[in-house]
Amino acid sequence: MAKGQSLQDPFLNALRRERVPVSIYLVNGIKLQGQIESFDQFVILLKNTVSQMVYKHAISTVVPSRPVSHHSNTPSGGTSNYHHGNNPSAPQQPQQESDDAE
């Protein structure tokens, strides 16, 4: 397994196993929605009313509809910062703040 996929594979696998609905944003801005049916090194098979093969190089962001728990294969059972919400660069659901702060 490539080092760059040590986070990607467990994350996608958790989404697939738990059948979590996801929004996948492509680099051209298009939003796709569905459940991850399967994936490999290059593509994700996204199922909604039809199955779509989405090339990973075209994906900008994968946003689960709910938090998922995914653990790496490290002895400590390390987790990513994504589902803890303490990584400011991680994709998150947009939250609207009131305009009173200005």
Swiss-Prot record:
SUPFAM superfamilies: Sm-like ribonucleoproteins. Residues 64-102 are annotated as: Disordered. It holds the Pfam family Hfq. One of its GO terms (molecular function) is RNA binding. It comes from the Bacteria. GO terms for cellular component: cytosol. Keywords: RNA-binding, Stress response. Gene3D superfamilies: 2.30.30.100. Residues 70-96 have a biased composition (Polar residues). GO terms for biological process: regulation of DNA-templated transcription; regulation of RNA stability; regulation of translation, ncRNA-mediated. Residues 9-68 form the Sm domain. RNA chaperone that binds small regulatory RNA (sRNAs) and mRNAs to facilitate mRNA translational regulation in response to envelope stress, environmental stress and changes in metabolite concentrations. Also binds with high specificity to tRNAs. Belongs to the Hfq family. Homohexamer. This is RNA-binding protein Hfq. It comes from Serratia proteamaculans (strain 568).
